[in-house]
């Protein structure tokens, strides 16, 4: 249990219990919680951050099935020499699946389109693509791509990242579980570790909003019933 907590340091007992159940471990939630606390295991606090001063608004488009709404956004980090790189993420807002990512020092509209093309080959095109107003996303070339795939572009209001809350949540999760604990040698090292983390996240990370299923488990369950 201590080893598990060490490798999942942002998981509380509920998420850990859900994961244990999925692996066939039979134990009641109250018993698991008692053991978790007896071992002195707690969710490690995040670093302090400035609180939001604006209200949390409801998204303008709500996904009600897989493939309806994808969200795309950038995240930044640096290697051990302090050289900054960008990570572009695409997630499915309904299943929370991490569908695609790309790691580069610089990234323009052409790179975004190439990543989206690969995601479409694997999953089909989304009905809606949610993004902020960054130059890579509002570029005419991305608009043409969306038109060719019958995809509506949904841009969030400037300066209001909480409208892209699903992908922001992914950013926080990856920073907590991967970026803060690793020093990347170069881009290939970052790509390898992020790729491995993405696989674990999709297959193993329980979400309370998904009934404590992982994104892949939830997608499979939905497909079985629809």
Question: Where are each of the predicted segments found?
Answer:
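Charged DNA-binding/catalytic regions of mobile-element recombinases
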Residues: 1-226
């Amino acid at each position: 249990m201590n080893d598990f907590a060490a490798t999942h340091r942002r998981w509380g007992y509920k998420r850990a219990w859900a994961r244990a159940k999925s692996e066939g471990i039979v134990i009641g939630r109250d018993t698991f919680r008692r053991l978790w606390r007896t071992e002195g295991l707690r969710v490690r606090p995040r670093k302090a951050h400035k609180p939001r001063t604006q209200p949390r608004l409801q998204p303008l488009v709500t996904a009600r099935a897989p493939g309806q709404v994808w969200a795309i956004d950038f995240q930044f980090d640096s290697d051990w020499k302090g050289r900054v790189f960008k990570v572009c993420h695409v997630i499915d807002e309904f299943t929370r699946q991490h569908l695609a990512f790309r790691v580069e020092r610089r990234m323009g509209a052409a790179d975004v389109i190439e990543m989206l093309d690969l995601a479409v080959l694997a999953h089909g095109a989304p009905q809606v693509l949610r993004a902020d107003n960054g130059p890579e996303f509002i570029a005419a070339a991305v608009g043409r791509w969306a038109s060719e795939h019958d995809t509506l572009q949904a841009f969030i209001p400037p300066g209001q990242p909480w409208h892209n809350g699903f992908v922001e949540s992914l950013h926080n999760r990856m920073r907590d579980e991967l970026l803060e604990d690793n020093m990347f040698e170069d881009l290939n090292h970052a790509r390898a570790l992020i790729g491995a983390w993405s696989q674990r996240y999709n297959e193993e990370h329980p979400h309370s909003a998904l009934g404590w299923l992982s994104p892949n488990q939830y997608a499979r369950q939905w497909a079985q019933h629809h």
